[in-house]
Amino acid sequence: MIFTLEVIGFNIESCTIAQLAGAHRIELCDNPGEGGTTPSYGFIKTARKNLQIDLFPIIRPRGGDFLYFDEEFEVMKADVKICKELECDAVVIGMLYSDGTVDKKRCSQLVELAYPLGVTFHRAFDRVADPLKALEDIIDVGCERILTSGLQPNALDGAEMIASLIKQANERIIIMPGSGVRSDNIIELAKKTGATEFHSSARMYINSNMTYTNAAMKE
């Protein structure tokens, strides 16, 4: 089976390692503790310079929910323009209304603004009230891909829903499983869902090289 693998890059080193390991693209994010927020101008610029594979920065001005104020939306539009300026390949977005439906109006504006860059709808999808309707809304908006764990904490638990989404999508949009995707379960997930694109953090923690630390500062 031939898969497309997207790996999250939270820093330049992880982006470089992912590229060397064979990742096909990077979803570029800051703040892993918040689930990923918009990377800085400098981060995007340096990643674009250093990477030959596709680069997809997330457009998410803060952690928390996906219901944004008008001022936050202005920030998102500005960040999309930066991604175009820096020659990224796509952006990753997601906005909802308070009732758990897709904010089609503002998502459409970002898709139009991003053109000719591609657009992925991120895991805001896993917070929607009606996933099958949300799928149709996102297709209407013009996104080329949805990242989802099938409305469950991890993609294996959501495999049945992911399979249903792929069936309904009928090749009109790519459904990309993410969350808990690893080398030891990707084949199982592919068989259960029919997916061919996958998203993984492939995260590991390394010790600091600092030789001095202040024991009083534990935050």
Residue ranges with predicted function:
Residues F10-A21, L67-K81, D126-V141, I162-I175, ...:
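Catalytic cores of alpha/beta
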